[in-house]
């Protein structure tokens, strides 16, 4: 699956002030995803395993 990475509060994980390539590494390391990029202003991940939670508009609390 694909989607936005979340922080510990369930909000989209910001990449606003992160260096280039940060989101790819973050998605691979923390979400076990195949890749990711900064979809300004938040990290978007591809190939996320089904058991890993990604940000969902329906359950957004931010």
Swiss-Prot record:
Paired cysteines (S-S): 11-62, 15-38, 23-43, 27-45
Keyword entries, A-Z: Amidation, Disulfide bond, Ion channel impairing toxin, Neurotoxin, Secreted, Toxin, Voltage-gated sodium channel impairing toxin
Compartments (UniProt record): Secreted
Entry comment describing in which tissues the protein is expressed: Expressed by the venom gland.
Protein name as catalogued: Toxin Tst2
Function according to Swiss-Prot or TrEMBL: Alpha toxins bind voltage-independently at site-3 of sodium channels (Nav) and inhibit the inactivation of the activated channels, thereby blocking neuronal transmission. Is toxic to mice.
Organism, scientific name: Tityus stigmurus
Keyword Mitochondrion: no
GO BP terms in the entry: defense response
Pfam families linked to this entry: Toxin_3
PROSITE patterns associated with the record: LCN_CSAB (PS51863)
GO molecular function terms attached to this record: sodium channel inhibitor activity; toxin activity
One cellular component term from this protein's GO annotations in UniProt: extracellular region
InterPro entries with a match to the protein in the record: LCN-type_CS_alpha_beta_dom (IPR044062), Scorpion_toxin-like (IPR003614), Scorpion_toxin-like_sf (IPR036574), Scorpion_toxinL (IPR018218), Scorpion_toxinL/defensin (IPR002061)
Assigned protein family: Belongs to the long (4 C-C) scorpion toxin superfamily. Sodium channel inhibitor family. Beta subfamily.
Entry domain remark: Has the structural arrangement of an alpha-helix connected to antiparallel beta-sheets by disulfide bonds (CS-alpha/beta).
Keyword Secreted included in the entry's annotation: yes
Positions carrying Cysteine amide: 62
Chief localisation class: secreted
Record domain LCN-type CS-alpha/beta: where: 1-62
């Amino acid at each position: 699956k694909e989607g936005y990475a979340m922080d510990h509060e369930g909000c989209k994980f910001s990449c606003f002030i992160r260096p280039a390539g940060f989101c790819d590494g973050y998605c691979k390391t923390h979400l076990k995803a195949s890749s990711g990029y900064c979809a300004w202003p938040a990290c978007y991940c591809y190939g996320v395993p089904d058991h890993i939670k990604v940000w969902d508009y329906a359950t957004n609390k931010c």
